[in-house]
Amino acid sequence: MSKERLLKVLLAPHVSEKSALLADASEQYIFKVVPNATKPEVKQAVESLFDVKVQSVNMINIKGKTKVFKGRVGKRNGLRKAIVRLAPGQEIDFVGAE
C-alpha cells in the first residue's frame, strides 16, 4: 500500500467525552476515516503514523441525518469511524504529535 494512501485514510481523531473515556479505560482510540477505508488500511496507517502496535480495528458506518430547512428536505453527510485498540502499554499522545 502506498504511503500517500496511508496518509489519506485517517481524516481526524474523533474527540468526544465517550472517546476520551475509551482512551483512558481501555486503550481504544476513535478516528474519522474515508468512506472506502478497510480495517487493514486503518491498522497500517495508525501503526506507521503513530509508531504503535495495533491489536484490533472495528469500523462503524453512521448514516447522515435527514433535516428540514425552510420547508426543504435535505440530508447531512454520513460518516465512517474506526475504533482502534492498541496493544497493552501503548498510547497515542495527540497533543505532542506533529
From Swiss-Prot:
Gene Ontology CC terms: ribonucleoprotein complex; ribosome
NCBIfam families assigned to the protein according to its UniProt record, in alphabetical order: PRK05738.1-3, PRK05738.2-4
Subunit structure: Part of the 50S ribosomal subunit. Contacts protein L29, and trigger factor when it is bound to the ribosome.
Entry similarity comment: Belongs to the universal ribosomal protein uL23 family.
Lineage: Bacteria, Pseudomonadati, Pseudomonadota, Gammaproteobacteria, Thiotrichales
GO BP terms: translation
InterPro entries, A to Z: Nucleotide-bd_a/b_plait_sf, Ribosomal_uL23-like, Ribosomal_uL23/eL15/eS24_sf, Ribosomal_uL23_CS
Statement: the UniProt record of this protein carries the keyword rRNA-binding: yes
A single MF term (Gene Ontology): structural constituent of ribosome
Listed name of the protein: Large ribosomal subunit protein uL23
Top-level division of the source organism's lineage: Bacteria
Protein keywords: Ribonucleoprotein, Ribosomal protein, RNA-binding, rRNA-binding
Function text: One of the early assembly proteins it binds 23S rRNA. One of the proteins that surrounds the polypeptide exit tunnel on the outside of the ribosome. Forms the main docking site for trigger factor binding to the ribosome.
